[in-house]
Amino acid sequence: MDIRVNNVIGNPFAEMVYDNQKNVREPFQIQLENKESMEKVEEVSEGEVLGIGFLKDSDSDISYGMAARYAEESTKDHPIVQVLLRKPNNEVEYYNVDITKVNPANATELEMFALCNYMDDKNPGARGKFGSWQALKCIDINACSNGYTFDTGLLENFASAKKNWIGICRMMMDDYLGAGIFKQYKDCINLCSEFSKFV
C-alpha cells in the first residue's frame, strides 16, 4: 500500500472525522495506490461534445475552457472520455480518462469532469437542469467556502490534486439539510448514489 499526504482530501476507510461541531477534518488522509486513469495524449477526438467546463488561472481573473467528448478508442464496455483543455498562450492539451478506473472517493477534478459528463450521457434523466458537473461544482465551491476542502479548479492542480468527492457531498448534505436548502441536499443524494457505482 502506498501511503502519501500529497494534496489528497478524503480517506477511503473513514470518510471524514468531525468534532462535535462537524467542522474538523482529520489532519491527514490515506491514499490507496490507484490504477492510473488519466493519460495525456496527442490524438484528437472528433466526437460530439458531451459537456463543457471552466478552470481558473490563480494568477489572473481569466478562466480557460475545457470540453469532454468520447475518445476514438472508447467502447460501450470500456468507455474513455477525452478532455480538451485550453491554456494560456492558446495552448491546448488533451487527456484521455479511462472511466472504468476512476474512483470518485479519490479522484482529481479532471477525472470527475470526465466521469460526470459520461454519467449524464448514459443517464440523461439524472443529470438535472444543468448537469452533474455543475451540480458537483456548486457543492464543491460551498465546501471550500466552509473550510472543508481546498480549491482544485485551478490550472495548476486540476489534474494532480485528488479529493474524496463522495465525502464532500456527504458532508455538505448535512449542511444543506440544516439550512433548509433542499435542492442542493437532493443533488448530494443523487450524486452520491451515482458515484457509488464507480467505487
Features from the language model and the residues they span:
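Type III/flagellar secretion export determinants
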Residues: M1-V199
